[in-house]
Amino acid sequence: MNTGGRLIAGSHNRNEFVLINADENARIRSVQELSGQTCQICRDEIELTVDGEPFVACNECAFPVCRPCYEYERREGNQACPQCKTRFKRLKGSPRVEGDEEEDDIDDLDNEFEYGNNGIGFDQVSEGMSISRRNSGFPQSDLDSAPPGSQIPLLTYGDEDVEISSDRHALIVPPSLGGHGNRVHPVSLSDPTVAAHPRPMVPQKDLAVYGYGSVAWKDRMEEWKRKQNEKLQVVRHEGDPDFEDGDDADFPMMDEGRQPLSRKIPIKSSKINPYRMLIVLRLVILGLFFHYRILHPVKDAYALWLISVICEIWFAVSWVLDQFPKWYPIERETYLDRLSLRYEKEGKPSGLSPVDVFVSTVDPLKEPPLITANTVLSILAVDYPVDKVACYVSDDGAAMLTFEALSETAEFARKWVPFCKKYCIEPRAPEWYFCHKMDYLKNKVHPAFVRERRAMKRDYEEFKVKINALVATAQKVPEDGWTMQDGTPWPGNSVRDHPGMIQVFLGSDGVRDVENNELPRLVYVSREKRPGFDHHKKAGAMNSLIRVSGVLSNAPYLLNVDCDHYINNSKALREAMCFMMDPQSGKKICYVQFPQRFDGIDRHDRYSNRNVVFFDINMKGLDGLQGPIYVGTGCVFRRQALYGFDAPKKKKGPRKTCNCWPKWCLLCFGSRKNRKAKTVAADKKKKNREASKQIHALENIEEGRVTKGSNVEQSTEAMQMKLEKKFGQSPVFVASARMENGGMARNASPACLLKEAIQVISCGYEDKTEWGKEIGWIYGSVTEDILTGFKMHSHGWRSVYCTPKLAAFKGSAPINLSDRLHQVLRWALGSVEIFLSRHCPIWYGYGGGLKWLERLSYINSVVYPWTSLPLIVYCSLPAICLLTGKFIVPEISNYASILFMALFSSIAITGILEMQWGKVGIDDWWRNEQFWVIGGVSAHLFALFQGLLKVLAGVDTNFTVTSKAADDGEFSDLYLFKWTSLLIPPMTLLIINVIGVIVGVSDAISNGYDSWGPLFGRLFFALWVIIHLYPFLKGLLGKQDRMPTIIVVWSILLASILTLLWVRVNPFVAKGGPILEICGLDCL
């Protein structure tokens, strides 16, 4: 890198980069280089001084600035050199300004306003030529980063017009300010009679009236920039593979583009260190607590004591599994400007990697087409190069309603996409953009915006009416099924028996938007279904999309979103690319997971729909280990990682050995046995990487890079057979899988590609392949997301958790408690299936690249449904204690009191510290605690039994799609209780504990003051359960949110039966009873 003898300096935190002269010789050379150069502010030639030397404004870096600009900058600007930021010193003949040092040896006041032979006064310096950067509206860094000899903006931050003569200058309003490059304020710098012109009030006005003609501004500006780039000196950085040799980018921009695209932000030590210390302290307290509990049994209630101790031990193990993965939480920050500097260069095609976006839907009646349409529209309007985005919609229900709705969506996208990109609309899902109560005029300066917004809102309302009409028509299905417009029967009339369907709506036949711009590709996909084939539900649909996209577009990165999760931040793909395309750390990242945020939830969030504790605490903790788990939506994948390849390994340097010692010497702190074990593990890893090496080996063979004596044809055929056995029998798809960086085969006709795409979504394509086993979304559980992420982490990949300030995605949450419990039931059922399968993280994946703390998190994700058994038993103990007068602990001593207080205090303080570093409110934390109990005694319990029946007895459970919110009114059904058997267990527990409290208080009143002491512990125990089940109590007592009568009746009946049964077979009452004797008294 040639720095011209200047010293490189900068600040990473302040995002600054400058070049400073290192010695006087370099400064002299820089001064000599000024001869014949032009001012980098106004483009006038730098004049000579009286001594015949070029005028030098800055003695530190000799940045080329003419005398008038120097004087104006000292008077109206920031009085500093644009390049090195050194304050301009007062030169001979220059007027004094505020802040100048007292100097007696330069000149006197008589010459203070003389400029030598120039004869130019301040009243002759044009205001139109240079306006203070403080009023420009451009960021300061635009000028601060200018290098020596490079083109930097005028002080007005405008551009020069090449058509204007050298003695006249025009301010060009940049397009980013809405001026579209029009010329304003022609002024003369040589004629003092020309007055300075003010800024126009309306820059968008046709400026041909100012006398400059109507020549296309864009053509003239491109020509001017080309000429200027030929004249200006360019500082090139040699040897950088990310920048081509012919780039004319200036040095500071190049340096900025070479910096990392993201960085880790560890939690402050003042927050995380007390948290870690408390975790260790809590472990010690737990040890002392269990030591006391085990050594002090309750003799008259031994069964209660034993059951309670077993439950408490399980809760402690569950807490350890949940706690230690949060040991090292981190946050991350991305730099979108650096991404643009590195991969988006002016005048060249964008270097950003293509992305294929997958949207999955099943039933349009439960997943309204309008919601799916908004998701698709937000994807098509994303802030990303249109030729690098392809949207694939999987319709696993083969519904003609979805097909027709997508057709209407493609037509409306021709208007919506250019509107969003023209006015930088956020969010870009029209339903949420038009319904949100916000100041939509904020930062909008274009006068036509209001008019076009009204027209667009009217167009969207018409679009909604069309979609609603389609939904109404779909309610009445014809007896013979649906037909197309030409009378052909709709292929998907039979949901379980239909051929594969692919329809490319946008991006293929030259369909453009209303402004004649290209649109992203939009493809409808419905895979083939036939009786007798296992279609693997959502996982099978996603694998079909992988293969279709690999044939049609083959982008190296994939984004997966549910049909109800729209893109809320149009720069979401760029946020992910800051990690994926980072040359330093991006190669080992398998996916970037975004948090789930939701609309349609009230601020109280009674049923913990937002799940804030998981997304803002647990996921940040996992990000500090090997990365967050995959949650099923809002995730950007690396295609090669989904193909089952191992993560690239870093080359390790040579290790130190002790060859000078005999083999029996153990000074190397090792043994033969350990070395042998490591060798076995290394051989196992080597075998796991053979598949990934095949691809690169096959590429080498195709390019002719093979070893001497090898049989090219045999090697190619053998590897091709292995790849076809792994990926399937489609040669086009196998060829695309070999391309690590994506891309399409040359000279491939659309007809051939479409034929191959139909083949890869056929029913039998996955037979005798590794799809669903080692490739793509993994089969074997209804929660395929956990298995898929676990597989990739086991191959040594790491994931990243990205939390931009503006939520990347937003979705619809379950409307009421019943739907919420059914959603949790499905998640828990999937965890039970994984726990009982060969992919259980307790015994699967050893010897790979999975870190042990990451393994703990996966174990916790599949073990948590089993906590429902001890939880429901433990929540029943308070009622039993109150009904029988027994308790799970003996009389408490002072030592025991201290232990209990220390344990409860550590639990509370741990929660407080988690809320502090996770930035979670106490309401969200408490709702999460409540729903942990509610879900644990209901959905988790049912999932446990269903999972055991499914795995052990083969009784399959149907997957129920969670209903998405319709637009029937804000929070209309949010607290509506619907009939479901999931509500009976928690309701029964609530009634039993309420009965127990009533019985206990009545007994204490009857027995007097001495009974209140032992009662306090039992009451506290029962109230703890009642408070956690408070939403049910409110539903039982409230008028608006009343619980269904059938649930109340069943719960009361069950509670009464259990209470009477306990009274009948009370194990704590002596079986024999008292011996009656005749006392001789006549008792009446």
From Swiss-Prot:
GO molecular function: cellulose synthase (UDP-forming) activity; zinc ion binding
Any one biological process term the GO annotation gives: cortical microtubule organization
Listed cofactors: Zn(2+); Mn(2+)
Binding sites annotated in the UniProt record for Mn(2+): K538, D562
Localization per Swiss-Prot or TrEMBL: Cell membrane
Matches recorded under PROSITE patterns: ZF_RING_2
Signal peptide start and end residues: none
Tissue note: Expressed in germinating seeds, seedlings, roots, stems, leaves and flowers. Not present in mature flowers.
Zn finger residue spans: RING-type: 39-85
Name of protein: Cellulose synthase A catalytic subunit 6 [UDP-forming]
Native organism: Arabidopsis thaliana (Mouse-ear cress)
